[in-house]
């Protein structure tokens, strides 16, 4: 496998950077950090074609592709397929399983809640929708908020109770992780693991992407050793390795041909009548796409409008 790693070109395709993070996507950042902790050379490419796709991030090399929505996510797929496995000697430990439950279950649940509900989606535009027209971005935001509430089991009747439960679990998870970590470099003494990738991603995203009014952010900052842990690993593995970054790639879904990262410059050519007609049709297509999204959300949501508007009714 080591010989293959020296010859293969690996690419992680993620959502674009923002908030001084290499990728602002909370699903993409753990995969990026995992590869950095493993010191596996790879290129970072960005895909904004499908802003709400659950396939992102994905990892590819030649004909091999690991998608986020398959086999437990990119990191689990890379471990399973023997590409890179930081947890090979840890997965049987009881501590590993209990910490994974805290990080991948409770903290991931809390972050999902905070992004879409707790902070009312303040950060989501920069992460997912900044390249889209305002109206379409709003429609997709309401759709994703509805889906997030469904995943978290939030209804109009139990919203307050679920909020308290989610924040309580997050507080307990931070307390347990802070105690476990102490002043160690990694969660498991002197070696990085996938759990470090998830935890470091969680901490960096909360501190750098969420507003200062975030409840989850305030709870995290109560544990100074968790913040120091993140600062040290960020400095060693993220900032040091990005001192001479490779030029960014523009990536398309793996079934599409990828453009060269350095296209040749072409002289500006006057648009023909046919090109002008095509551009006009594209505008109509965009409008039709928007209407399709609205109809889809209306049909899919059914009762979702009640859930999204119940706060206004209480007012």
From Swiss-Prot:
- Where along the chain is composition biased (Basic and acidic residues)? 267-277
Q: Disordered: where is this region?
A: 240-277
Per the record, residues carrying N-acetylmethionine are 1
Q: Which residues form a coiled coil?
A: 157-181
Give the tissue specificity: Expressed in roots, young cotyledons, flowers and leaves.
Spell out where the chain crosses the membrane: 195-215, 284-304
**Main localization, broad class:** mitochondrion
The protein's superkingdom reads Eukaryota
Its membrane topology is listed as:
Multi-pass membrane protein
Is the keyword Ribosomal protein in the record? Answer: no
* Reported consequences of knocking out the gene: Decreased growth, abnormal leaf morphology and ectopic floral development and sterility. Higher starch accumulation in chloroplasts and reduced rates of mitochondrial protein import.
Q: Which Pfam families match?
A: GST_C_6, GST_N_4
Q: Which UniProt keywords apply?
A: Acetylation, Coiled coil, Membrane, Mitochondrion, Mitochondrion inner membrane, Mitochondrion outer membrane, Transmembrane, Transmembrane helix
Q: Where in the cell is it found?
A: Mitochondrion inner membrane; Mitochondrion outer membrane
Sorted alphabetically, the Gene Ontology BP terms of this entry are: mitochondrion organization; protein targeting to mitochondrion
Q: Name one GO cellular component term.
A: mitochondrial inner membrane
What task does this protein carry out?
Involved in transport of proteins into the mitochondrion.
Q: Which family does the record assign? A: Belongs to the metaxin family.
PANTHER family registered for this protein in UniProt: FAILED AXON CONNECTIONS-RELATED, METAXIN RELATED
Query: What do we know about how this protein assembles, alone or with others?
Result: Part of a high molecular weight complex that is distinct from the TOM complex. Interacts with a variety of mitochondrial precursor proteins.
The protein here is known as Mitochondrial outer membrane import complex protein METAXIN
Organism source for this protein? Arabidopsis thaliana (Mouse-ear cress)
């Amino acid at each position: 496998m080591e010989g293959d790693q020296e010859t293969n070109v690996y690419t992680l395709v993620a959502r674009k950077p923002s908030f001084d993070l290499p990728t602002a996507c909370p699903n993409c950042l753990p995969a990026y950090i995992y590869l950095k902790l493993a010191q596996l050379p790879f290129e970072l490419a960005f895909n904004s074609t499908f802003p709400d796709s659950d396939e992102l991030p994905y990892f590819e090399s030649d004909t091999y592709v690991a998608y986020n929505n398959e086999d437990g996510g990119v990191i689990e797929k890379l471990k399973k397929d023997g590409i890179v496995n930081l947890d090979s000697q840890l997965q049987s430990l009881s501590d590993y399983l209990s910490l994974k439950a805290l990080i991948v279950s409770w903290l991931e649940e809390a972050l999902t809640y905070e992004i879409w509900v707790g902070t009312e989606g303040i950060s989501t535009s920069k992460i997912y929708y900044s390249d889209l027209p305002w109206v379409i971005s709003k429609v997709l935001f309401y759709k994703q908020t509805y889906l997030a509430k469904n995943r978290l089991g939030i209804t109009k009747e139990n919203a307050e109770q679920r909020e308290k439960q989610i924040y309580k679990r997050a507080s307990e998870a931070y307390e347990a992780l802070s105690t476990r970590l102490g002043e160690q470099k990694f969660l498991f003494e002197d070696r990085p693991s996938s759990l470090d990738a998830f935890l470091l991603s969680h901490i960096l995203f909360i501190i750098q992407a969420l507003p200062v009014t975030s409840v989850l952010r305030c709870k995290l900052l109560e544990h100074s050793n968790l913040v120091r842990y993140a600062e040290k690993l960020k400095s060693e593995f993220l900032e040091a390795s990005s001192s001479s970054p490779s030029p960014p790639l523009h990536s398309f879904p793996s079934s599409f041909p990828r453009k060269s990262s350095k296209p040749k410059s072409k002289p500006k050519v006057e648009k023909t009548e046919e090109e002008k007609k095509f551009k006009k049709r594209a505008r109509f297509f965009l409008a039709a796409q928007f209407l399709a999204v609205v109809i889809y959300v209306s049909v899919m949501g059914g009762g979702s409008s009640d859930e999204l508007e119940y706060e206004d009714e209480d007012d």
